[in-house]
């Protein structure tokens, strides 16, 4: 059987973090899971695209809207399954074995962890994992593994600058389940803005989006000082 999973990674000025993300995928190649890596770039001026190409990834470029980038990346991919990862996410060693065991159970995400120590990092990650278990609402930094047919039936990622991960998860018919393997994500924004402040900001953002505020209006309020990875 051919390798079933396409990896899709949205990038923007990701030269510093992308190599470690790609390195964590090697075990998936060794296990015969990954057929390709697609990097959907939003117009990086650093070495992001050349790094991706050096690692053998397919690169597609377009406007820097994460929803649009993901939509283009998935459209270019060919795997029966798609695994969406952020460019600052590193998968825990052993992830490929768990993915093999869970692939027949529908959409999956990883357990969130931060590449930082301290109680604040653990509490924020614990809340994210609890939210996933109770509300079936993971965020994009936990990764998302799903069958292409489920992705297509949900309408795919909307071309919007943020909350594209929430929009897709809400549209999925099979509920997303959380695996035990961790996705370690960057903590720089939390460390710069403060763990509490950043966490409250994310809750307000979700609440406003849930109340019907347009993603473009949210982006004007939040993204000028907080560009996506």
Residue ranges, per PLM feature:
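Cell-envelope/extracellular polymer assembly enzymes that use nucleotide-activated donors
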Residues: 4-6, 36, 167
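Conserved donor NDP-sugar-binding/catalytic core segment of glycosyltransferases
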Residues: 93-120
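Short aromatic/hydrophobic "clamp" motif used to bind/position activated sugar donors
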Residues: 82
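A short, conserved alpha-helix in the catalytic core of glycosyltransferases
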Residues: 150-154, 160-178, 182
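Short beta-strand/loop segment that forms part of the nucleotide-sugar
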Residues: 23-26, 33-43, 62
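A conserved acidic beta->alpha catalytic loop
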Residues: 41-49, 89
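Short, well-formed alpha-helical segments that are part of the catalytic scaffolds
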Residues: 13-29
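Hydrophobic helical membrane-anchoring modules
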Residues: 1, 170-229
